[in-house]
From Swiss-Prot:
It comes from Homo sapiens. The gene is THOP1. GO terms for biological process: peptide metabolic process; protein polyubiquitination; proteolysis. The keyword Chloroplast does not apply. The lineage of its organism: Eukaryota, Metazoa, Chordata, Craniata, Vertebrata. This is Thimet oligopeptidase. Gene3D superfamilies: Collagenase (Catalytic Domain), Endopeptidase. Chain P, domain 1, Neurolysin, domain 3. It catalyses: Preferential cleavage of bonds with hydrophobic residues at P1, P2 and P3' and a small residue at P1' in substrates of 5 to 15 residues. GO terms for molecular function: metal ion binding; metalloendopeptidase activity. One of its GO terms (cellular component) is cytosol. The modification N6-acetyllysine is found at K257, K538.
Length: 689
């Protein structure tokens, strides 16, 4: 066989001509979504058929690898147009049509991933091609396709392949239904004004009033978190916490059990002992034993800190019960946690979150945040007035490289809750930044979706400090999408190892704990005054408040995830309750089933929730080694970060990117110090007022 016709030298590099076209559209009817889904499947299948039916002697880079890469670019964009509206469209009909499209396309994805004929031709190409004739990223793409083929069992007997295909299709549908149930949940609880004691006026004014005069509290984040933090009526907190962790209890509990069973079956067919081992093969951690050791060691280090914090909380509860004439049961309940953790911030660190949020109107935060990111990463953002989107609240921005003026991408901001909308905060990649069929560069487009408190007649949207942190985090993912310069869609943006994917955006959370960035994105919504420096200093000092309990809870969630995907007979609710008691020291509320509300289990983080903590090892190392040492707003370090960490996307291993940015292998020291733990004789001392 001759060497492939299109080799390394023929492929365009990052300096390729750039196409600034936004191919996305959001005006499709439910019928059009259905029709376009069918058309997309037919068009894409034709390409796979052409690749899979070619004679082996005709297999070349152009006819096989490039053909698959090109169709992936088109397919990804068109698929996102069809399946993204299920998360954000204000129309229930559109959301339903989009969900159905996602199900059909997910089934089609499984069919295409199980094409043994295509796999055989990719293997043939690898055996015949001269390795040095491929550009490094093309070689990586070829290797990845073969790896994915083996992970789908395409080297196994046909009967086994059919079993795997059947399981994969069922898993896709179950995951879609699990998260659809949560998105469409409309549960609310009615309360009197007295039952909502302790909540600020702007919160109460934002609640819908019912015919009987009671106020309607939903289980969406802008209602749930403020109430759990500030309502001084324990019974109200109990009802809301219980309802929140009983959402979709029956239907999602059944789905979760089936998910866990099917994942285990598929993994065994592929020769893996557990689903966790199957998933982790592609991650930095590699094995479930490595993850278990990481979580166990961290839990052991954090437990003494958690015990101290529980003692403080219990004393706060005793004092409050005495002050309000309430019975004191001598125990911390699940509905007490956020309330008294908030009190720790207010009493030990003198941070009044209600006062603080008056300095974080969303427009001021947005302006400051965008300014910091532009300065740090050498970018310039421009708001596109009147751009079409899926809702009137949504804003579209263009991002350019500040030095060259070249467009690097676009991003949508969709910040406020709506009925039926995705209920958390997330970044959705909508158009991958990669090379098109003609060698020109397609710009990346992403959407940041959040659920911040909506403006009222009396006040703009005011953000809690933890919402500002969330904003910084998710926008970090947006920047990862836009700044990557991969050649292949498969490696664009955040397509890195799952236990590294959070590190770039976690690293950027540090800016909301630094004085200069905080001053730049805050201003009192009435007076326009800056945050008093004393309040700012107390906020920064409060970063380590409750760090033991917060991180022990993260370990609980990670361990639940690992348990479900290493022990198929584990009962999700029982496992969660056991770990809450053992690790956190706070029992789960009887009758609840938190895992049935845990969207990560059906949202691509199966056996990988540990990645949030694992990624922090790298995010803290990057921040303290470079930015903290050389300046948190140092644009040279920012450009190094853009070049070394964001630019490659998934075209390199994360370990190689980290070594290049840090100048050495990563270390855990900064991570442990950030958790309030002693490292080499240094122990951070939280300051109190």
């Amino acid at each position: 066989m001759k060497p492939p016709a299109a080799c390394a030298g023929d492929m365009a590099d990052a300096a390729s001509p750039c196409s600034v076209v936004n191919d996305l559209r959001w005006d499709l009817s439910a019928q059009q979504i259905e029709e376009r889904t069918r058309e997309l499947i037919e068009q894409t299948k034709r390409v796979y058929d052409q690749v899979g039916t070619q004679e082996f002697e005709d297999v070349s880079y152009e006819s096989t690898l490039k053909a698959l890469a090109d169709v992936e670019v088109t397919y990804t964009v068109q698929r996102n147009i069809l399946d993204f509206p299920q998360h954000v469209s204000p129309s229930k009909d559109i959301r339903t049509a989009s969900t159905e499209a996602d199900k059909k396309l997910s089934e089609f994805d499984v069919e295409m991933s199980m094409r043994e004929d295509v796999y055989q031709r990719i293997v043939w190409l690898q055996e015949k091609v001269q390795k040095d004739s491929l550009r490094p990223e093309a070689a990586r793409y070829l290797e990845r396709l073969i790896k994915l083929g083996r992970r789908n069992g395409l080297h196994l007997p046909r009967e086994t392949q059919e079993n795997i295909k059947r399981i994969k299709k069922k898993l896709s549908l179950l995951c879609i239904d699990f998260n659809k149930n949560l998105n469409e949940d409309t549960t609310f609880l009615p309360f009197t004004l007295q039952e909502l004691g302790g909540l600020p006026e702007d919160f109460l004014n934002s609640l819908e009033k019912m015919e009987d005069g009671k106020l309607k509290v939903t289980l969406k984040y802008p209602h749930y978190f403020p109430l759990l933090k500030k309502c001084h009526v324990p019974e109200t907190r109990r009802k809301v916490e219980e309802a929140f962790n009983c959402r979709c209890k029956e239907e999602n509990c059944a789905i979760l059990k089936e998910l866990v069973t099917l994942r285990a079956q598929k993994s065994r067919l592929l020769g893996f002992h557990t689903h966790a081992d199957y998933v982790l093969e592609m991650n930095m951690a590699k094995t479930s034993q490595t993850v278990a050791t990481f979580l166990d060691e961290l839990a052991q280090k954090l437990k003494p800190l958690g015990e101290q914090e529980r003692a403080v909380i219990l004393e706060l509860k005793r004092a409050e019960c005495e002050r309000r004439g309430l019975p004191f049961d001598g125990r911390i309940r699940a509905w007490d946690m956020r309330y008294y953790m908030n009190q720790v911030e207010e009493t030990r660190y003198c941070v009044d979150q209600n006062l603080l949020k008056e300095y974080f109107p969303v427009q001021v935060v947005t302006h400051g945040l965008l300014g910091i990111y532009q300065e740090l990463l050498g970018l310039a953002f421009h708001h596109e007035e009147g751009a079409s989107a899926w809702h009137e609240d949504v804003r579209l921005y263009t991002a350019r490289d500040a030095a060259s003026g070249e467009v690097v991408g676009k991003f949508y901001l969709d910040l406020y809750p709506r009925e039926g909308k995705y209920g958390h905060a997330a970044c959705f990649g909508l158009q991958p930044g990669c090379l098109r069929q003609d060698g020109s560069r397609q710009i990346a487009i992403a959407a940041m979706v959040a659920n911040f408190t909506k403006p009222t007649a009396d006040a703009p949207s005011l953000l809690q400090h933890d919402e500002v942190e969330t904003y910084f985090h998710e926008f970090g993912h947006v920047m990862h999408q836009l700044c990557s310069q991969a050649e292949f869609a498969m490696f664009s943006g955040t397509h890195v190892e799952r236990d590294f994917v959070e590190a770039p955006s976690q690293m950027l959370e540090n800016w909301v704990w630094e004085q200069e960035p905080l001053l730049r994105m805050s201003r009192h919504y009435r007076t326009g005054s800056a945050v008093p420096r004393e309040l700012l200093e107390k906020l920064i000092e409060s970063r380590q408040a409750n760090t033991g309990l917060f991180n022990l809870r993260q370990i609980v969630l990670a361990k639940v995830d690992q348990a479900l995907h290493t022990q198929t007979d584990a009962d999700p609710a029982e496992e969660y309750a056991r770990l809450c008691q053992e690790i956190l020291g706070v029992p789960a509320t009887p009758g609840t089933n938190m895992p049935a509300t845990f969207g990560h289990l059906a949202g691509g983080y199966d056996a990988q929730y540990y990645g949030y903590l694992w990624s922090e090892v790298y995010s803290m190392d990057m921040f303290h080694t470079r930015f903290k040492q050389e300046g948190v707003l140092n644009s040279k370090v920012g450009m190094d970060y853009r070049s070394c960490i964001l630019r490659p996307g998934g075209s390199e291993d994360a370990s190689a990117m980290l070594r290049r940015f840090l100048g050495r292998d990563p270390k855990q020291d900064a991570f442990l110090l950030s958790k309030g733990l002693q490292v080499g004789g240094c122990e951070p001392e939280p300051q109190v007022c």
